[in-house]
């Protein structure tokens, strides 16, 4: 009685075995990166580009163009860059780590950590909380009004100037009701974290972010030697100043190598294991449908959920769900995107020319991520965006 059943089972497995025998071997991550990186560079119209891709145990670096117009030197792993608004991800990391130490609560009101005598606006009695600052739901504007045109990036407003402005400000919406991108909010958040810890923010940043990962070139105050390595854009370049004024929102200088080290902590490999702490850093706080409106969050694609700096785009058109963050300033455009459950991530930085556009760069990175995921054995996703 068992024989027909076994024969039927064997016959049913034959096609699967046959398919397994002809299935192509997965490509090296470097082969996929090579296919996409040059297209991303030329599509973006950049002066120079550096890219770091991680796929499990594989880390790939690629670069194109020049570190400054006309010098014919490709960007290097240690070229100094501005990560711009990717700085916000590190500010949120400091916040989460202080919360784990018990030094703050994510739902603490900003007023708890305001300078003595400072006023923090509320909306019908609802306070701005730290979690609102980190999710762009504070009700504060994108920038503090009144900045001088053509000023260097990330040098205004200073700490005293933003708190003086805040004392006169009024909120137009309840915190937590809508999302509107706010650089000002993140600088106030870094001020609050420094006060809560009783430590200057640069020292806190070094203690919690850069020193544990060996990020030796990541700073707010680059040395003359580091400034000599700063990539320079054809359009929008800014002096290599200290950026302590924009310490929470966009002031971080770094290198592709340091950013690869930082990105690796979010992705499992044989030597790195994603921790529960890292899971908390990428917790999604608001679904889009929980908010009255969402402004300034859809640059590389529609934001379906917001985390603490991170933005999640759900699966679409053959692409997997992607968690990402964009940045730009001082002639730089940056983008970090990853699919953590598949241990793939990409960081890219470009310097601008008059022709530079963000979307061709981010679309190329998103397609590369999808193909890296599809290249993994057993994954159903595959994108062939470049023949």
Regions of interest found by a model, annotated:
Residues 26-81, 103:
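Short, conserved catalytic-motif segment at the N-terminal edge
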Residues 1-6:
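Bacterial N-terminal signal peptides that target proteins for export
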Residues 288-295, 301, 315, 352-387:
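Short, gly/Ser/Thr-rich active-site loops of penicillin-recognizing serine hydrolases
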Residues 68, 121-330:
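Short, surface-exposed loop or secondary-structure junction motifs
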Residues 324-325, 333-352:
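Short, well-ordered beta-strand elements
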Residues 34-37, 51, 57-59, 80-107, ...:
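Active-site SXXK
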Residues 15-17:
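N-terminal signal peptide c-region/cleavage motif recognized by signal peptidases
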